[in-house]
Curated annotation (Swiss-Prot):
This is Complement factor B. InterPro entries: Sushi/SCR/CCP_sf, Sushi_SCR_CCP_dom. It comes from Sus scrofa. Residues 1-25 form the signal peptide. Residues 270-469 form the VWFA domain.
Length: 765
C-alpha cells in the first residue's frame, strides 16, 4: 500500500473509538510469568493458533464457517500455565476444536409465526416469518443464516399500529420484557448465557413515536462485522452528523462539487482525535494509527465541511498538540501536517496508559467552548475518535469522563429535547481481545444507527478506511435544506420548481415540480398537452429571475387522460407523472438542490437505513399501514408578494384509506362512476378530509408539486400532486369533509423513473 494509506498494522488489536480497559475476553496477566508457557498440547482440532502480546496471549483461529470452542483466547498465567479450557457454563474441556458456526434461533416472535422451527440453524438455512390477521409485517419476511453467525436482513415485526410507538420487535437471539408501547413505556432486552448484548438493553417510547437508543443484538465472541458493513454504517451515521450541521446550524452550503461551510467563531462541529502512544502500542502501530487518522480527516474533508479539530496523544500523560481554540484547527491540511509531525518517541520516557487523563483534555476543550461562546455552544456537535489498544493501567475508568462530557453538553437531561445529536462516540473494536460489553457501554446509542463495531483484524480495519475513501457512489445532499431564520423560501425548499406553459390564444398555465437531478424536474403529466412546444415551457428555480429552457418532456407511457371517456369518465389521471429534461445542466447552490427520491442510495442514507435495506423495506419505513404525516408546498400571495408555505397533511394509508378514496366519487365529472377503482387506482396516495385532523387541500396551481415526508431532518418525495375532488381555492366557505387530494405514489412508478434517470447517478436500489 502507498504511504498515504492506512497500512497493515500487525496483530496488536487497535480500537478506533472509546474503549475502556480490560479488553481481553480473559483477563490479561498482571505480571509476566516466571517461565514461558509451554506450547505443547495446546493445539486446536481443525484449526491453528498464534501468539499475541509477546507470547502472553494465544489466539485460536478456525477456517471460514467455523469458530474455536470453547474459547478463542487463552492467557499465560503467572504460574507458567495457560488459562483453562472451559465453556460459559464452566464445564472443563480437554481439547479445543473448531465447530461449525450456527445462527441463533428466535427466542420469541410476537403476533405471528416463523418456519421452520429448530433448536439451531446452519449456514445458508432460511427462516420465514408470517403475521396473524390484523397485523402488518415490517422488516424481512425471509432471512438467511450467514457465515458471520448472523441473520441477513432486518428484524421481522408484526404490528397492528395500535401503540403510540411502533412495536420495537424482538431481534433474533434476544428476549424482550414489555408489551405496552404507550408514551414513556419501556421494554428491556436480554441475551442467553454466553452471549453479549450490543445496543440498548432498555428502550423507552418517546414523544414523536420513536424509541430511545438503538436496536439490540446478541453477539457471540466469534462474531465480527465485515468491513463493508462497518464502512456503510459508519459513513451513514457520520454523514448524518456532518450534513446535520449543514441543515440545522444555519450555515449555507455551497454548490454540489465545492460544498463548504464557513463556521462562526464557536464552530459547528468539533472532532477530537486522541492517539494512544503507550508502550503496548509500539512504534509501527503508532505510525499506522496516524495514517488511519489522516484517512479519517480526508473523508470528512470530502464532505466539504470544515470542523475544528483537537489532537491529543497520550501515554502516562497527555500532550495536547492542537486545541479547537486554535484558529488553524479548521484547516484540514494544517491538521494533517501536525499529525505527521508527532512521533512515538514523544512518550518514550513515561509509557504507561492513562486514557482517562487524555479524555479529560477533551473535556477541557469542550469546556473552553462552553465558557467562551455561551450563545453558540449548544449548537456545536462533537465527535470523539480515539485510537488505542484499550489497556489503561492508571488513572481510573475513562467511562466516568464520558458521563461528565454528557453533563457538560446538557445531553440526556431533558426528555423533550435530549440533544443526543450533539455527541457521537464511535467504538471500533479490532481483534480477538475486544471486550464487547465494555465497548458497547461506551458507544453512542441512536435509533437506526450503529456506533459500536467489532472487526476481525487490522486488515479488516484497513479495508474499512479503503471503502470509506474509495466508495464511488454519491453520498448525496438530496433533501437537505437551510432552515436558518435568515433563509429565504428557496433556501428552505431548494428543490421547488415553477413551471409555466404559454399557449397562443389560450393563455397561460402554471404547475409545480421538484428538482430530482442536475438535468431533471419531476412534475405531473396533465400540466402539458400534446400540442405544447418546448419553447413555450419555462422552468423557474431558486427564486431567480432566470428561466431555464427545456429539452423535452417525458411522459409515463401509460398516462392517457382520455383513456376512459367511453365509460363517461372525462378525465383519468392514472400514471399522471412526467419528467422535464432541462436543456442545460443545473449548477447546485444554496437555493437549488435536489429532493430525495424513494428507493435510492441517497434516501436510504437519509433515513440511516442499513446496507442491506431493500426498496420494499424502505417503503415500509416511509409509508407504513397507518396515517402518515406528510407535507406539500403551496405558493400564496402575502403583502403583494409570492411566498412558499409548507402545509402538513396526513396520507391515509391505513384504516382510513378506503373512506378517503371513496370521496373521489364526489368530484365534478365523476357523477356516473359507480366503482371507485375506476378512477382511483393502486398508484394513488390520498390526503385531505377532517379525520383525524382537518387537512389543508391543494389548489389547481399546486399540480405537479411533490408530496413530501420530512424525516431525520431530510425531505423525501413520495408522491406527485395530481388532482383534487374540490378546488377549494375557488370557494369562500370552509372545505367540505369530502375534499380530498390524490397524488401519484412514486413507489408505483419506480421502473419508469429508474429507466429515465439511469444516467443521473442517483443509485436506485
Amino acid at each position: 500500500m502507498g504511504s498515504n494509506r492506512c497500512p497493515r498494522l500487525g496483530l496488536v488489536p487497535l480500537i478506533l473509538g472509546l474503549l475502556s480497559g480490560g479488553v481481553s475476553m480473559t483477563p490479561l496477566p498482571e505480571a509476566r510469568p516466571q517461565s514461558p508457557c509451554s506450547l505443547e498440547g495446546i493445539e486446536i482440532k481443525g484449526g491453528t493458533f498464534h501468539l499475541l502480546k509477546e507470547g502472553l496471549v494465544l489466539e485460536y483461529v478456525c477456517p471460514s464457517g467455523f469458530y474455536p470452542y470453547p474459547v478463542q483466547i487463552r492467557t499465560c498465567r503467572s504460574s507458567g500455565s495457560w488459562s483453562t479450557l472451559q465453556t460459559q457454563d464452566r464445564k472443563i474441556v480437554k481439547r479445543a476444536e473448531c465447530k461449525a458456526i450456527r445462527c441463533p434461533r428466535p427466542q420469541d416472535f410476537e403476533n405471528g409465526e416463523y418456519w421452520p422451527r429448530a433448536a439451531y440453524y446452519n449456514l445458508s438455512d432460511e427462516i420465514s416469518f408470517h403475521c396473524y390477521d390484523g397485523y402488518t409485517l415490517r422488516g424481512s419476511a425471509n432471512r438467511t443464516c450467514q457465515v458471520t453467525g448472523r441473520w441477513d436482513g432486518q428484524t421481522a415485526i408484526c404490528d397492528d399500529g395500535a401503540g403510540y410507538c411502533p412495536n420495537p420487535g424482538i431481534p433474533i437471539g434476544t428476549r424482550k420484557v414489555g408489551t405496552q408501547y404507550r408514551l414513556e413505556d419501556s421494554v428491556t432486552y436480554y441475551c442467553s448465557r454466553g452471549l453479549t448484548l450490543r445496543g440498548s438493553q432498555r428502550r423507552t417510547c418517546q414523544e414523536g413515536g420513536s424509541w430511545s437508543g438503538t436496536e439490540p443484538s446478541c453477539q457471540d465472541s466469534f462474531m465480527y462485522d465485515t468491513p463493508a458493513e462497518v464502512a456503510e454504517a459508519f459513513l451513514s451515521s457520520l454523514t448524518e452528523t456532518i450534513e446535520g450541521v449543514d441543515a440545522e446550524d444555519g450555515h449555507i452550503p455551497g454548490d454540489q462539487q465545492k460544498r463548504k461551510i464557513v463556521l462562526d467563531p464557536s464552530g459547528s462541529m468539533n472532532i477530537y482525535l486522541v492517539l494512544d502512544g503507550s508502550d503496548s502500542i509500539g512504534a509501527r502501530n503508532f505510525t499506522g494509527a496516524k495514517n488511519c487518522l489522516k484517512d479519517f480527516i480526508e473523508k470528512v474533508a470530502s464532505y466539504g465541511v470544515k470542523p475544528k479539530y483537537g489532537l491529543v496523544t497520550y501515554a502516562t500523560d497527555p500532550k495536547v498538540l492542537i486545541r479547537v481554540s486554535n484558529p488553524k484547527s479548521a484547516d484540514a491540511d494544517w491538521v494533517t501536517e501536525q499529525l505527521d509531525k508527532i512521533s512515538y518517541d514523544d512518550h518514550k520516557l513515561k509509557a504507561g496508559t492513562n486514557t482517562k487523563k487524555a479524555l479529560l483534555e477533551v473535556y477541557n476543550m469542550m469546556s473552553w467552548g462552553v465558557n467562551n461562546f455561551p450563545d453558540n455552544w449548544n449548537r456545536t456537535r462533537h465527535v470523539i475518535v480515539l485510537l488505542t489498544d484499550g489497556l489503561h493501567n492508571m488513572g481510573g475508568d475513562p467511562v466516568t469522563v464520558i458521563h461528565d462530557i454528557r453533563d457538560l453538553l446538557n445531553i440526556g437531561r431533558n426528555r423533550k429535547n435530549p440533544r443526543e445529536d450533539y455527541l457521537d462516540i464511535y467504538v471500533f473494536g479490532v481483534g480477538p481481545l475486544v471486550n464487547q460489553e465494555n465497548i458497547n457501554a461506551l458507544a453512542s446509542k441512536k435509533d437506526k444507527e450503529q456506533h459500536v463495531f467489532k472487526l476481525k483484524d487490522v486488515d479488516n480495519l484497513e479495508d474499512v478506511f479503503f471503502q470509506m475513501l474509495d466508495e464511488s457512489r454519491s453520498l448525496g445532499l438530496c433533501g437537505m435544506v437551510w432552515e436558518h431564520k435568515d433563509g429565504t423560501d428557496y433556501h428552505k425548499q431548494p428543490w421547488h420548481a415553477k413551471i409555466s406553459i404559454t399557449r397562443p390564444s389560450k393563455g397561460h398555465e402554471s404547475c409545480m415540480g421538484a428538482v430530482v437531478s442536475e438535468y431533471f424536474v419531476l412534475t405531473a403529466a396533465h400540466c402539458f398537452t400534446v400540442d405544447d412546444e418546448k419553447h413555450s415551457i419555462k422552468v423557474s428555480l431558486g427564486g431567480k429571475k432566470q428561466e431555464w429552457e427545456i429539452d423535452q418532456v417525458l411522459f409515463h407511457p401509460n398516462y392517457d387522460l382520455n383513456a376512459k371517456t367511453a365509460k363517461d369518465i372525462p378525465e383519468f389521471y392514472d400514471y399522471d407523472v412526467a419528467l422535464i429534461r432541462l436543456s442545460k445542466k443545473l449548477k447546485y447552490d444554496q437555493t437549488i438542490r435536489p429532493i430525495c427520491l424513494p428507493c435510492t442510495e441517497g434516501s436510504n442514507q437519509a433515513l440511516r437505513l442499513p446496507l442491506t435495506t431493500t426498496c420494499q423495506q424502505q417503503m415500509q419505513e416511509l409509508l407504513p399501514a397507518k396515517d402518515v404525516k406528510a407535507l406539500f408546498v403551496s405558493e400564496l400571495t402575502k403583502d403583494h408578494r409570492k411566498i412558499l408555505t409548507r402545509k402538513e397533511v396526513y396520507i391515509k394509508n391505513g384504516e382510513r384509506k378506503a373512506a378517503c378514496e371513496r370521496d373521489a366519487l364526489q368530484a365534478q365529472g365523476y357523477e356516473k362512476v359507480k366503482v371507485v377503482s375506476e378512477v382511483v387506482t393502486p398508484r394513488f396516495l390520498c390526503t385531505g378530509g377532517v379525520i383525524p385532523y382537518a387537512d389543508p387541500n391543494t389548489c389547481k396551481g399546486d399540480s405537479g408539486g411533490p408530496l413530501i415526508i420530512h424525516k431525520k431532518s431530510r425531505f423525501i418525495q413520495v408522491g406527485v400532486i395530481s388532482w383534487g375532488v374540490v378546488d377549494i381555492c375557488k370557494r369562500q366557505q370552509q372545505a367540505p369533509s369530502y375534499a380530498r387530494d390524490f397524488h401519484i405514489n412514486l413507489y408505483k412508478v419506480l421502473p419508469w423513473l429508474k429507466e429515465k434517470l439511469k444516467d443521473e447517478d442517483l443509485g436506485f436500489l
